Amino acid sequence: MEPPGDWGPPPWRSTPKTDVLRLVLYLTFLGAPCYAPALPSCKEDEYPVGSECCPKCSPGYRVKEACGELTGTVCEPCPPGTYIAHLNGLSKCLQCQMCDPAMGLRASRNCSRTENAVCGCSPGHFCIVQDGDHCAACRAYATSSPGQRVQKGGTESQDTLCQNCPPGTFSPNGTLEECQHQTKCSWLVTKAGAGTSSSHWVWWFLSGSLVIVIVCSTVGLIICVKRRKPRGDVVKVIVSVQRKRQEAEGEATVIEALQAPPDVTTVAVEETIPSFTGRSPNH
């Protein structure tokens, strides 16, 4: 009895399938080393262009046209707002750094064709993000609160350092470098409220009537002085006018007396000779 034809061994194929050949070829090419065309070895002041070396442009210039067999590199200056700091073979210049005032920045060194701008902090700000010699972001100085003193002022790299006032001292606005001592109460006054590190002692008189009496007395004195002052001034003026008038009249009298001619009256003098004739000395 012969076995059925389906039970026999599979027939042998001497030719491999097409898929197997493709796989072998793929693995062969995948493992093969890849060779790229070698770039020319150029000097430090040259840059490669294809298989040739061209001279680099100076700082502040870019390549406008690469060199040829008979021509050198054509360079042109960088436009405003751009720069190149080194010898280069670049076709475009680099954009200058912008210092944004909204970030508290200002240009500590302006941009030129050969140097990039360097940003620093605006006055009243300190740097919070440092990038080499360039500051990328700044922040405003902290403000000391009332009751604090400025222990150390802010710098371009450090914020303001604040410190609380010790007991018995105060700082009204936080801008003082040293806190002030609070006033001590005397026996005439009493403390209306406890002094804090941010406010001074508040003092009031013991009796409100004393304040009223002083104020009323002062106001009354001022009113009396103002009322009497004009009357006294009038009296002074009258007395002064009368005195001047009297002085003027006296001076006029003296002048008239000096200018008047002298009043001379001639009196005849009769000479009498005593007669002793006929009289004896006994009479």
UniProtKB/Swiss-Prot annotation:
TNFR-Cys repeats: 42-75, 78-119, 121-162
PTM remark: N-glycosylated.
Chain segments annotated as coiled-coil in the UniProt record: none
Annotated glycosylation sites: N110, N173
Record InterPro entries: TNFR/NGFR_Cys_rich_reg, TNFR_14, TNFRSF14/UL144_N
Membrane topology: Single-pass type I membrane protein
GO molecular function, a single term: cytokine binding
A GO BP annotation: negative regulation of alpha-beta T cell proliferation
Statement: the UniProt record of this protein carries the keyword Cytoplasm: no
Effect on the protein of changing Y61A: Abolishes cis interactions with BTLA
Extracellular side: 39-202
Tissue spec: Widely expressed, with the highest expression in lung, spleen and thymus. Expressed in a subpopulation of B cells and monocytes. Expressed in naive T cells.
A GO cellular component entry from the record: external side of plasma membrane
Alphabetically ordered keywords of this record: Adaptive immunity, Cell membrane, Disulfide bond, Glycoprotein, Host cell receptor for virus entry, Host-virus interaction, Immunity, Innate immunity, Membrane, Phosphoprotein, Receptor, Repeat, Signal, Transmembrane, Transmembrane helix
Signal sequence interval, chain numbering: 1-38
Function of the molecule: Receptor for four distinct ligands: The TNF superfamily members TNFSF14/LIGHT and homotrimeric LTA/lymphotoxin-alpha and the immunoglobulin superfamily members BTLA and CD160, altogether defining a complex stimulatory and inhibitory signaling network. Signals via the TRAF2-TRAF3 E3 ligase pathway to promote immune cell survival and differentiation. Participates in bidirectional cell-cell contact signaling between antigen presenting cells and lymphocytes. In response to ligation of TNFSF14/LIGHT, delivers costimulatory signals to T cells, promoting cell proliferation and effector functions. (Microbial infection) Acts as a receptor for Herpes simplex virus 1/HHV-1.
Family: Belongs to the tumor necrosis factor receptor superfamily.
Record's protein name: Tumor necrosis factor receptor superfamily member 14
Organism of origin: Homo sapiens
This protein's encoding gene: TNFRSF14
